[in-house]
């Protein structure tokens, strides 16, 4: 769900949608080799990491970077220990890790990827600078949640559902 929220947000902006296409979500635990073969030619691959997918995402990100050292590996979610000073010594294959909310940061990353690839002015990131950490400060919070379209209402999941008619899909509403 979280990656779909990120894409729902950035897909509102024409400068993003005319340059980028959303690939298929990593939602099953396919064999790492199969996932790497499918993703290694992408320019950017992002991981939204939680307790239930941390190990898999970590291995997949590491193997993707081995297969294509030029791929930009993004990470986010509550399961990366971003407070650790040696984060990129533990995860040298991750290029950028988003702290807290990632919607605005993700949009800026996509914009900078097309131009100067200098992400240091984007708030809310940890950037891997050859194993050293550049911390760009706190993320810009979203004041109005209505600025993020629901991925359930924007057809983001439609192609995934059409590709897998054998699966009975359901949606979950989660609140605080």
Residue ranges of predicted features:
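Conserved acidic
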Residues: 2, 56, 171
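Glycine-rich beta-alpha loop elements in corrinoid/cobalamin-binding modules
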Residues: 9, 19-144
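A structural motif corresponding to the C-terminal end of an alpha-helix
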Residues: 13-16
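Short catalytic helix/loop segments, enriched in acidic residues and glycine
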Residues: 2-11
């Amino acid at each position: 769900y979280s990656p779909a929220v990120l894409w729902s947000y950035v897909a509102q902006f024409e400068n993003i949608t005319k340059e980028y296409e959303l690939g298929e979500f990593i939602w099953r635990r396919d064999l790492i080799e199969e996932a790497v073969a499918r993703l290694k030619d992408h320019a950017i691959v992002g991981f939204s990491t939680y307790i239930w997918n941390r190990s898999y995402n970590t291995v997949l990100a590491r193997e993707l970077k081995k297969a294509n050292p030029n791929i930009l590996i993004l990470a986010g979610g509550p399961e990366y220990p971003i407070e650790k000073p040696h984060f990129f010594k533990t995860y040298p294959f991750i290029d950028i890790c988003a702290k807290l909310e990632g919607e605005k940061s993700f949009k800026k990353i996509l914009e900078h990827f097309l131009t100067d690839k200098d992400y240091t002015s984007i708030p809310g990131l940890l950037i891997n600078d050859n194993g050293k950490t550049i911390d760009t400060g706190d993320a810009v919070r979203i004041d109005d949640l209505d600025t993020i379209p629901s991925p359930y209402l924007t057809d983001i999941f439609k192609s995934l559902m059409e590709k897998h008619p054998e699966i009975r899909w359901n949606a979950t509403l989660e609140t605080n």
